Amino acid sequence: MISCLVIIDVQNGFLTNETNNVPDRIKELLSREKFDHIVATKYMNHEGSPCYKQLNWTSLMTKESQALDKYVESISERVFEKDTYSCFTDEFKEYLKKENITDLHFVGIDTDCCVLGSLYDAFDAGYNYKVYLDCCASCGGKKQHDSAVVVMERVFGKQHLITK
């Protein structure tokens, strides 16, 4: 079994009062858990992205807002850019296959958007998975985070959701 910590979208544009504790919580997680691989994703909004076209969402369109948190960047062996909620781009799927990764461990921002979207794809693709809830948060606040947790419990099973 080969594990990979997948750090979802811990970027300057997503670090708010609601989410700014995520990098420190990831650091704490890494002090108690070991993973074979650590990768990160970056959400890249642009005029052709679904969020821009369908939601008219214009945030995260500058290099500064798209930049990864410095700590996350320093620990990630690879960074995968995406313009969808899920991290399961062709490049990401090829990486998982090449590295024979079987177990995905998710942390990051937003619990109710990109973490949840990636979890659906991990489940459908047959990966073993865990979500470290104390290392996730939502820019929309605790209510959105908690709502996503309710969905995750029902759809993916409480046994896959880890709290400190």
Residue ranges and their predicted role:
Residues I2-C4, S31-R32, H37, W57-K164:
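Active-site-adjacent betaalpha module
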Residues V6-I8:
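Short hydrophobic beta-strand that contains or immediately precedes a catalytic carboxylate
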Residues E18-E33:
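…and closely analogous acidic/polar surface helices at protein-protein or active-site interfaces
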Residues S49-K53:
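Metal-dependent catalytic neighborhoods of phosphoester/phosphodiester hydrolases
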Residues T19-V22, Q54-S59:
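Short glycine-enriched, charge-decorated loop/helix-capping segments at active-site entrances
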Residues Q11-N12, N45, A137:
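Short, glycine/acidic-enriched loop or turn micro-motifs at the edges of active sites
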Residues V10-E18:
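Short acidic, Gly/Ser-rich segments with clustered Asp/Glu that frequently serve as metal-coordination loops
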Residues E33-G48:
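Von Willebrand factor
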